[in-house]
UniProtKB/Swiss-Prot annotation:
Assembly with partners or alone: Interacts with hair keratins.
Source species: Homo sapiens
Alphabetical list of InterPro entries matching this protein: KAP (IPR002494)
Family of the protein in this entry: Belongs to the KRTAP type 4 family.
Sequence repeat copies, ranges: 24-28, 29-33, 34-38, 39-43, 44-48, 49-53, 54-58, 59-63, 69-73, 74-78, 84-88, 89-93, 94-98, 99-103, 104-108, 109-113, 114-118, 119-123, 124-128, 129-133, 134-138, 139-143, 144-148, 149-153, 159-163, 164-168, 169-173, 174-178
PANTHER family linked to this entry: KERATIN ASSOCIATED PROTEIN, KERATIN-ASSOCIATED PROTEIN 4-6
Tissues of expression: Expressed in the hair follicles.
Recorded GO CC terms: cytosol; keratin filament
Gene assigned in the entry: KRTAP4-9
Role this protein plays: In the hair cortex, hair keratin intermediate filaments are embedded in an interfilamentous matrix, consisting of hair keratin-associated proteins (KRTAP), which are essential for the formation of a rigid and resistant hair shaft through their extensive disulfide bond cross-linking with abundant cysteine residues of hair keratins. The matrix proteins include the high-sulfur and high-glycine-tyrosine keratins.
Identification of the protein by name: Keratin-associated protein 4-9
Keywords: Keratin, Repeat
Length: 210
C-alpha cells in the first residue's frame, strides 16, 4: 500500500535510500537515509538530516545548526552557535557572544556583544568595541580612545587624547607632542611619568609633577 503523505514513490515501510525523490520530502519521510539535495526543504530540517549536502538556505533551522551545515547560506538568526562561527558566517546578524572566534573578528562583527579579548585585532577597533577587555596596542586607534580604554598598553601616539588621560594611561609617549599642553597634559594626567623635557608647559606644573 502506498503512503498517502509521501507520494507514489514511497512505501508504507519508510523512506529507503533508493526512494528519496523530490516528491518524498515531507516530515514523515525525513529519515537519515533521505538526506539528499532534492530533499532539502524546511519540512525536512530535522536533526537526523543535517548533512553538508542538505545545507541550503531553506534548511537553516535550529535543529540543523551543526559545523557541517555552517555555510554562507546558513548565517541566520537560528544558526548562532559556536560551532557555526566560520569565516563565511561572519556577518553582523551573526555577531553574538557565543560566536566571537578569531575567524569571526571582522569589522562587520565589531559590536558590543562581540568584544572579547580574542577578537581584539586591528580591523575590529571600533568605538563600540572599546571595552576594558579589548584595550590592546593594536586596538589603540583614534576612534578607540574612550575613557574605558585608557590602559598602559593603549598609550601610543594615536591614542593620546584628553579622554584617554587617566592615571593608568599617563606614559611618556603621551607627552611628546607640541600640543601636549592641551592634549596629554590634562588635569587627570599630571603624573611624573608625563613630565619630560619636551613637555615643559605651565599647564603641566602641578604639585605632583614638580
Amino acid at each position: 500500500m502506498v503512503s498517502s503523505c509521501c507520494g507514489s514513490v514511497c512505501s508504507d515501510q519508510g523512506c529507503g535510500q533508493d526512494l528519496c525523490q523530490e516528491t518524498c520530502c515531507r516530515p514523515s519521510c525525513c529519515e537519515t537515509t533521505c538526506c539528499r539535495t532534492t530533499c532539502c526543504r524546511p519540512s525536512c530540517c530535522v536533526s537526523s538530516c543535517c548533512r553538508p549536502q542538505c545545507c541550503q538556505s531553506v534548511c537553516c533551522q535550529p535543529t540543523c545548526s551543526r559545523p557541517s551545515c555552517c555555510q554562507t547560506t546558513c548565517c541566520r538568526t537560528t544558526c548562532y552557535r559556536p560551532s557555526c562561527c566560520v569565516s563565511s558566517c561572519c556577518r553582523p546578524q551573526c555577531c553574538q557572544p557565543a560566536c566571537c572566534q578569531p575567524t569571526c573578528c571582522r569589522p562587520s562583527c565589531c559590536e558590543t556583544t562581540c568584544c572579547h579579548p580574542r577578537c581584539c585585532i586591528s580591523s575590529c577597533c571600533r568605538p563600540s568595541c572599546c571595552v576594558s577587555s579589548c584595550c590592546k596596542p593594536q586596538c589603540c586607534q583614534s576612534v578607540c580612545c574612550q575613557p574605558n580604554c585608557c590602559r598602559p598598553s593603549c598609550s601610543i601616539s594615536s591614542c593620546c587624547r584628553p579622554s584617554c588621560c587617566e592615571s593608568s594611561c599617563c606614559r611618556p609617549c603621551c607627552c611628546v607632542r607640541p600640543v601636549c599642553g592641551r592634549v596629554s597634559c590634562h588635569t587627570t594626567c599630571y603624573r611624573p611619568t608625563c613630565v619630560i623635557s619636551s613637555c615643559p608647559r605651565p599647564l603641566c606644573c602641578a604639585s605632583s609633577c614638580c
